[in-house]
UniProtKB/Swiss-Prot annotation:
Protein name: Uncharacterized protein RP050
Keyword Lipoprotein in annotation: no
Gene3D superfamilies the UniProt entry points to: Carbonic anhydrase
Keyword RNA-binding found: no
Keywords, sorted A to Z: Signal
Signal peptide segment: 1-21
Listed GO MF terms: carbonate dehydratase activity; zinc ion binding
Matching InterPro entries: Carbonic_anhydrase_sf (IPR036874), Pro_CA_2 (IPR046871)
Length: 188
């Protein structure tokens, strides 16, 4: 009887996946996908100096990669993406996001000898709008101050839990312009 339930469950799951694939033209015909192999030197590399904590927003994927390259961190970072980036660590509604970040830092330190954290927030962030409210974001200056406050809280949390790590904080515009956010930011 249990075996029959297992077979029926597997059939339902496979049928659901096939139905999804049939209605999703992007992946429907993709049985095997070949992607370019990593650079040869990366295959045996065991160290990533940095964890990048960035937003999940699809609009800035290329710009984020370009930033990491300009910072000299291309091929030497692990990436953690959650809505709001630094806000994921400090928000009070989804506290498990913060725990996820902390647990990830802990394990990546053991695996990759992490030395620093880079938080990359971005302007016009939907998570910020939902979790802290548009009234704190409705001008460029208010938005920068809101991000700076959250980035500084995130920096403090990381420094307290992982005092050996350096922490850097950045704010990216949708135009790709990136500002480093320092601890002593004040509205101008």
């Amino acid at each position: 009887m249990i075996y029959m339930k297992y077979i029926i469950s597997c059939f339902i799951i496979v049928s659901s996946l096939n139905l999804y694939a049939a209605h999703n033209n992007v992946i429907a015909d993709k049985k095997v996908i070949k992607v370019a192999a990593s650079k040869e030197h990366l295959k045996t590399l065991k160290v990533a100096s940095t964890i990048l904590i960035s937003c999940v927003d699809f609009r800035l994927i290329n710009e984020t990669s370009k930033l990491m390259k300009q910072l000299g961190l291309e091929d030497t970072f692990d990436k953690v993406s959650l809505p709001g980036a630094s806000l994921a660590l400090v928000n009070e509604k989804y506290t498990y996001w913060g725990k996820t970040i902390e647990d990830t830092i802990e394990i990546l330190q053991a695996l990759h000898n992490i030395e620093q954290i880079v938080f990359l927030d971005h302007r016009e962030c939907g998570a910020y709008n939902i979790l802290i409210g548009n009234e704190h974001l409705n001008t460029k200056e208010k938005e920068k101050v809101a991000h700076a406050e959250i980035l500084n809280k995130a920096r403090d949390i990381i420094r307290e839990k992982f005092p050996q790590l350096k922490v850097y904080t950045f704010l990216m515009g949708l135009d790709g312009v990136v500002e480093q956010i320092y601890e002593d930011i004040t509205p101008s």
